[in-house]
Amino acid sequence: GSSPCRSVIMTAKAVGVELNKKLLNLQAGEHLKPEFLKINPQHTIPTLVDNGFALWESRAIQVYLVEKYGKTDSLYPKCPKKRAVINQRLYFDMGTLYQSFANYYYPQVFAKAPADPEAFKKIESAFEFLNTFLEGQEYAAGDSLTVADIALVASVSTFEVAGFEISKYANVNKWYENAKKVTPGWSENWAGCLEFKKFF
């Protein structure tokens, strides 16, 4: 149900790759078993193994899947400027948007800590940035769906099930409603979100 796993599932769907998914029980420490550490010493999920080649970090996996299996480069164009904007959005998603989710919600969910209002402000600030990026834009980076949209829709949908009010951000809300319709694998993403919702 995690956002990074769902972004990989949607990207695989977009390029027509059938994933052989293996569920790891993190609470039971399955990601710390020697056989998994051999594949990924950083023991993070998702981890992709493609004919013996192991890769982790969801956004790196997304780019790899598109570069290796995409019929066209539309999800991650070869043009340096287009690609730079996509990369910026991916890093924004990882370092600002999704990070704000983790900083605010994870201590509450996993450590039963009280809500931190300062961390909540960081979420609002991240959404304000995203709202600005999306001004007059149908897509997050350029004029068509890219891996940036897929990563961001995985994150934004996670905020939705956590109860964050996305509708307060008009540009984000408009983009998100469209992304639900045009992102391959959306229904599987939403099913994963609903799994994740049990934590909130």
UniProtKB/Swiss-Prot annotation:
It catalyses: RX + glutathione = an S-substituted glutathione + a halide anion + H(+); 1,1,1-trichloro-2,2-bis(4-chlorophenyl)ethane = 1,1-dichloro-2,2-bis(4-chlorophenyl)ethylene + chloride + H(+). It comes from the Eukaryota. Residues 1-73 form the GST N-terminal domain. Keywords: Lyase, Transferase. Its EC number is 2.5.1.18, 4.5.1.1. Glutathione binds at residues 2, 43-45, 57-59. One of its GO terms (biological process) is glutathione metabolic process. SUPFAM superfamilies: GST C-terminal domain-like, Thioredoxin-like. Residues 79-200 form the GST C-terminal domain. CDD domains: GST_C_Delta_Epsilon, GST_N_Delta_Epsilon. InterPro entries: Glutathione-S-Trfase_C-like (IPR010987), Glutathione-S-Trfase_C_sf (IPR036282), Glutathione_S-Trfase_N (IPR004045), GST_C (IPR004046), Thioredoxin-like_sf (IPR036249). One of its GO terms (molecular function) is DDT-dehydrochlorinase activity. Belongs to the GST superfamily. Theta family. Conjugation of reduced glutathione to a wide number of exogenous and endogenous hydrophobic electrophiles. Has DDT dehydrochlorinase activity. Homodimer. This is Glutathione S-transferase 1-1. It comes from Drosophila mauritiana. The gene is GstD1.
